[in-house]
Amino acid sequence: MLFLTQVREVVVSEVNIPLSFSDAAATRVQTLIAEEENPDLKLRVYITGGGCSGFQYGFTFDEKVNDGDTTIVNSGVTLVVDPMSLQYLMGGMVDYTEGLEGARFFVNNPNATTTCGCGASFSV
């Protein structure tokens, strides 16, 4: 039995990428992957229902890329997004920050009409 999978890979240097992956986020992911000693890990960003504003962002590490996923590569690090989540993230940027409130990955999302105070949830 033969299975075909369709995976769309986008390189950050391309002009019309659907979602950006910042250098700060890529650098932090590189560090975390090195700590885990698993070079197959990729950062997956996804959207779920919930949070203060209706939808919320989620981040996890994943070893596999599923059929239909979009992958975005920056500095040898891969960001993975499923097709349903990508529609809410188009034109956005996955970034990483460290500050007084702690360290976190976040999404700068131009599609969000409202966001909660912590930035973890949004509505469209």
Curated annotation (Swiss-Prot):
One GO CC term of this entry? Answer: cytosol
Q: Is the keyword Membrane in the record? A: no
**Any one of the GO BP annotations:** iron-sulfur cluster assembly
A Pfam family reported for this protein in Swiss-Prot or TrEMBL = Fe-S_biosyn
Residue positions binding iron-sulfur cluster = 52, 116, 118
What Gene Ontology molecular function terms does this protein carry?
A: 2 iron, 2 sulfur cluster binding; 4 iron, 4 sulfur cluster binding; iron ion binding
What InterPro entries does the annotation carry? FeS_biogenesis, FeS_cluster_insertion, FeS_cluster_insertion_CS, FeS_cluster_insertion_RrpA, HesB-like_dom_sf
Fetch the PROSITE patterns from UniProt. Answer: HESB
| UniProt keyword list | Iron, Iron-sulfur, Metal-binding
Q: SUPFAM superfamilies given for it?
A: HesB-like domain
Q: List the disulfide bonds.
A: none
| UniProt cofactor(s) | iron-sulfur cluster
Q: How is the cofactor bound?
A: Binds 1 iron-sulfur cluster per subunit.
Q: Which PANTHER family match?
A: IRON-SULFUR CLUSTER ASSEMBLY 2 HOMOLOG, MITOCHONDRIAL
NCBIfam families xrefs = iron-sulfur cluster assembly accessory protein, PRK13623.1
State the oligomer form and interacting partners: Homodimer.
What is the stated purpose of this protein? Required for insertion of 4Fe-4S clusters for at least IspG.
Q: What is this protein called?
A: Iron-sulfur cluster insertion protein ErpA
